[in-house]
Regions:
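Short, low-complexity disordered leader/linker segments with a strong preference
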Residues: 1-81, 388
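Transmembrane alpha-helix boundary/anchor motif
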Residues: 45, 176-180, 228
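N-terminal secretory/targeting leader peptides
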Residues: 51-58, 74-166, 185-388
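Hinge/lid segment of periplasmic solute-binding proteins
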Residues: 170-189
Length: 388
């Protein structure tokens, strides 16, 4: 299974964000390299002109004008290249490739993509800002990474809001509240294209298996620095311990913490199965990826090109969910091969965990931070109707 690009030595945190090399400094380096290339090209053009080739200079000028005209006419269905900034997730990378193929097909070859996966354009927050200002056309990132900017995304931090992936797909994303949250990206000058899957978070421990809520009592569990997450774990009896993700592997190896919780891909992608003996598929909170596009760029395209993007993205989204499920199965195989015991909760056990987490009142905490808390009430209403 490929979770981390084998050609680079990077660590990724529990938001799927690079904690290694691909940070803002590297973006600056990329820009410097690009500038150097442009300057070199300009020097070559100048030398050619000095050689007396006036016809070639005229041709070059005409080509430049043609390119400018082509760019300006993108709204008429002319060729356009979209820069896509992506994450480290294997399923998301697969889906971007799939999207690129489909959007090229459905646009009759007028749309191509320039794909920059593995946080090459910076972390989630940086790419979010780059897409707002037009430096990047489409970006993918964890909702947890940008909820401090887009407060309604805190709804996806509520523990046991969703009890299955199908609930997430049909209600969390496809319901009225989910659609309004996706549409809400427009306040940032962005077009919400889709919600993709980062996945359910699950518990791993190094000494004590967690099969019931009682097993969590006093367990020193590394968690995210998030008030909603902390309240839920305290309500379930654990001792939540925020810690830098970069320190987690060593902390588990040395017994500084008893365990941690993350999506399966993050667990095996960082080799946690090497220092943990047990994994319980608690599926306590589901974290999505957002997929957004610069609104001005989207609106500059022709109606046919916009339709091509919508159709290709819908198909790529279904494909991403399928790939995510495939990689999760491979992650379980990886853990078991390493000697880790993986336990799935039955419905009764999961409802026990949900009842304990609910006592932490995470929904109220989320609503306090949301700009549109009525969306939380609507989501709960839709889920209750869906479960009947």
């Amino acid at each position: 299974m490929v979770i981390i690009d084998e050609e680079v030595d990077l660590l990724y945190n529990d938001k799927g964000t690079c904690t290694g090399k691909n940070q803002k400094g590297e973006i600056t380096l990329m820009k410097k390299k690009a500038l150097a290339v442009l300057m070199a090209a300009a020097m070559v053009a100048s030398m050619t002109a000095c050689g007396g080739s006036s016809d070639k200079a005229a041709d070059s000028s005409a080509a430049t004008e043609d390119k400018a005209d082509s760019s300006a006419a993108a709204g008429d269905g002319e060729a356009v290249e979209l820069v896509v900034g992506g994450v480290t997730s294997s399923s998301a990378k697969d889906a971007v490739t799939y999207f690129g193929e489909k959007v090229n097909e459905y646009s009759n070859g007028t749309i191509t993509i320039a794909d920059f996966p593995d946080n090459q354009l910076g972390n989630d927050e940086q790419r979010f800002e780059m897409t707002q200002n037009g430096e990047c056309d489409i970006s993918i990132g964890s909702t947890s990474s940008v909820s401090a900017s887009y407060h309604d995304l805190y709804l996806y931090d509520v523990y046991y809001m969703f009890l299955s992936k199908q609930e997430v797909y049909d209600v969390g994303f496809g319901g009225e509240a989910g659609q309004k949250i996706l549409e809400g990206f427009d306040q940032f000058g962005l077009k919400g294209l889709a919600m993709w899957e980062n996945g359910f978070r699950n518990v791993t421990t190094n000494n004590t298996p967690v099969n019931t809520v009682a097993d969590l009592k006093g367990l020193k569990l590394r968690t995210m620095e998030n008030s909603i997450h902390l309240a839920a774990w305290k309500a379930m009896g654990a001792n939540p311990t925020p810690m830098a993700f970069s320190e987690l592997y060593t902390a588990m190896q040395q017994g500084t913490v008893d365990g941690e919780e993350n999506p399966l891909g993050i667990i095996t992608g960082n080799g946690f199965e090497e220092v943990e003996k047990y994994c319980t598929l608690t599926e306590h909170v589901y974290t999505p990826y957002y997929v957004v596009m610069n609104a001005d760029k989207y609106n500059s395209l022709s109606a046919d090109q916009q339709a091509a993007i919508e159709k290709a993205m819908a198909e790529a989204t279904t494909y991403q969910y399928e790939q995510s499920n495939k990689y999760e199965e491979e992650s379980i195989d990886t853990m078991e091969a390493a000697g880790c015991t993986v336990t799935a909760l039955d419905e009764a056990a999961k409802l026990e965990f949900k009842a304990a987490a609910d006592s932490g009142d995470g929904l109220s905490l989320a609503k306090e931070q949301m700009d549109n808390p009525d969306l939380a009430d609507k989501m709960v209403e839709e889920l209750e109707a869906y479960r009947k």
